[in-house]
Amino acid sequence: MRLMKLALAGVCALGLLSAGAANSAEPVKIRMAWVAPVANWASIILEKKDLALHMGKSYTLESARYQGTPQMITAIANNELEVSNLAYSSLAIAIENAGLDDVRVIADEFQDGVPGYYSSQFYVRKDSGINKVEDLKGKVVGTNGGGSAIDVAIRAMLHKHGLEEKRDYTMLEGPLPAMPAMLLEKKVDLIPAVLPFSFNPKLREEGRVLFEQREALGLTQMIMLTARKSFIDKNRAAMVDFTEDMLRIVHWYLDPKNHDEAAQIASKITKAPPERFGWLFTKADTYRDPDLMPNLEALQRNVDTTRELGFVKKQIDIKKYADLTLIQEAAKRLK
C-alpha cells in the first residue's frame, strides 16, 4: 500500500511538473508585415493592444515594414516573417517562383473595387498633357516594385490599351509615400496613389486621376494575411488566439463610434493632421471584411491576371492555398 501511495504521488508530481512546463512555455513570436501606414492592419494593430487578450500570453507580436509585398517573399522563405500581408500577385510569385507551396491565405486585409467603396487611383500632373492611357507611350511610370499588386494593376491597364513595358514605357521604382513627390517633381509621369497618400492636398491640387484600379482589374482581393502551413501546424493554438485578437481589434476600428479615436491613431502613425482621416473606415476607404474573410473567387481571377502578364507560368488553384479554419474558429469564440 505504501509503495502504491508513493507511486501515485510520483505520478501526480510528474503531472504537476508537466503542467508547470506547459504554462511556463515561451509565447510564440509572430512578426507581421505591412507596407502602407493605416491601410495595413499591422501598422495600427498594436495601438489597440489593450483589446488583445492573448497577446503576451500565448504569443507576442512585432510589426515590420517593407517597401512592397514582393520584398516579403525572401523574408518568408528565410523564416523571418510569420504573418505576411501578401498581395494577390506576390502570393502567386511566392507559390511558383519562390517555391513556397506551403504558404496559406488565412484572412482578408482589404479589397479594391467593391461597389460603393474606394478604388486605388493613378495620377498624372494636370499640366502633363496626358489625357488618356494611350498618352503614356514614351513616358515614365512609377511603381513600388515589380510584381506588387499596384504594379500588376498598372501593367494590366496599360496592356488593355496596347502599351507594354520597355517597348512603350519605362518603370521607375520608389516607395509609396514618395510617389506624390516623384510625380510633382517630374521624375515620373504616372503614379499609383494608394490610401492614405491619395489624399495628399498638394497631389490633389496639382494632379488628377487618369484611371482607377477597378477599371483595370474589377473587384480585387488586394491584400491577404498569409502564413506558412508548417508554422500554423506547429503553433495552431497561438495562431487562433492571434486571429481572435485581430478580429476583436478590427471590429473596434470598423465601429463608427470609434472613428475619431481611430483618426487620432492614424495621425500619430502618419504625422498628418487627424482631420485628413475623415475617410478612414468609411465607404471612402477600401472594403475591409469585418469577419476578415477573403474573397477567394476574386483572388482566383486576380492570380490568373498575374499569370496572363507573365509573372508566373502555371495555373494556380488558389483554394488549395487557403486555410480559413483559423478565422472561422476565432469567430466562433466571439459569438
Predicted regions and their residues:
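Pocket-lining segment of extracytoplasmic ligand-binding domains
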Residues: S89, P177-K268
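Conserved C-terminal helix/tail region of periplasmic/extracytoplasmic solute-binding proteins
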Residues: V303-K335
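Short, glycine-/small- and polar/acidic-enriched structural segments
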Residues: A25-E164, T170-E173, D189-L195, L219
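Secondary-structure end/capping motifs
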Residues: D233-K313
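Bacterial N-terminal signal peptides
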Residues: A7-S18
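Sec/Tat signal peptide C-region and signal peptidase I cleavage site
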Residues: S18-S24
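Positively charged n-region of N-terminal signal peptides that target proteins for export
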Residues: M1-L6
